[in-house]
UniProtKB/Swiss-Prot annotation:
One of its GO terms (biological process) is regulation of DNA-templated transcription. Belongs to the Alfin family. It comes from Oryza sativa subsp. japonica. One of its GO terms (molecular function) is histone binding. This is PHD finger protein ALFIN-LIKE 4. One of its GO terms (cellular component) is nucleus. Residues 154-164 have a biased composition (Low complexity). It comes from the Eukaryota. It is found in: Nucleus. Histone-binding component that specifically recognizes H3 tails trimethylated on 'Lys-4' (H3K4me3), which mark transcription start sites of virtually all active genes.
């Protein structure tokens, strides 16, 4: 759908809200990665000595820090300009939160720009709005406010990981991974039929919901659940991690 950071190739065939939502999800995923998993790389690229820089989320789930589009007016709505200038003048978490808020605004503006260009009627716009609203905002992900009911009150020294992240706080003293493994062993490898509840758990990196059979791991600092693939952790690697810290928490502690 997009031909570059700030340009767009419009196809005049009928485009659905689902098409625009897919574009929205890709751009959002890229921005979330920049502000969480790949925050160290993002931080370095936002050099205050450089010119006005913008953070672009791309439809393929990647991101780019670069100069704004040369076209005036730009073909696509532009993200916040000059995000690099405030980097060293603010607390890092406040700086990232500010960028997240502006990014949320930009994502919606791009989505509804496409809606206008594709001639969406009232029902199509409402459907697009409902789909975009079904995901946590970038700000909620960055600030750690994503789906608080998915956090577990687990006092175990073993990191929380497994194939089924919980929907509600779990007072069980055993790690979720051990509980699930024991249940499946006793039931011949069958799940507990709670997929409907589990589907509401959101990955803190990509913002996608839980799907049956996926491996997830929970950060012991911020207690946010992640797809193992999103944070490059495999089930085998998780077995040797006593306390897991997600990339965002690790990077914050490194610079403090």
């Amino acid at each position: 759908m997009d031909g570059g950071y700030g340009s767009v190739t419009i196809v005049h065939d009928a485009r659905s809200p689902e098409d625009v939502f897919q574009d929205f999800c890709g751009r959002r995923s890229g921005i979330v990665k920049a502000l969480t998993i790949e925050v160290e790389k993002f931080y370095k690229q936002c050099d205050p000595e450089k010119e006005n820089l913008c953070l672009y989320g791309l439809p393929n789930g990647t991101w780019a820090v670069t100069l704004p589009a040369d076209e005036v007016p730009p073909e696509l709505p532009e993200p916040a300009l000059g995000i690099n200038f405030a980097r060293d003048g603010m607390q890092e978490k406040d700086w990232l939160s500010l960028i997240a808020v502006h990014s949320d605004s930009w994502l919606l503006s791009v989505a509804f720009y496409f809606g206008a260009r594709f001639g969406f009627d009232k029902k199509a716009r409402e459907r697009l709005f409902m789909m975009t609203s079904s995901l946590p905002t970038v700000f909620e992900v960055v600030s750690g406010g994503v789906n608080t009911q998915s956090k577990t009150a687990n006092g175990s020294s073993k990191n929380k990981s497994g194939s089924k992240p919980p929907k509600r706080p779990n007072s069980d003293s055993k790690p979720q991974k051990q509980v699930q493994a024991k249940y499946e062993e006793e039931n011949g490898g069958r799940g507990n039929g709670g997929d409907e509840d589990q589907a509401e758990t959101i990955c803190g990196a990509c913002g996608e919901a839980y799907a049956n059979g996926e491996f997830w791991i929970c950060c012991d600092i911020c207690e946010t659940w992640f797809h193992g693939k999103c944070v490059r952790i495999t089930p085998a690697k998780a077995e040797h991690i006593k306390h897991y810290k997600c990339p965002g928490c690790s990077n914050k502690r490194t610079r403090e």
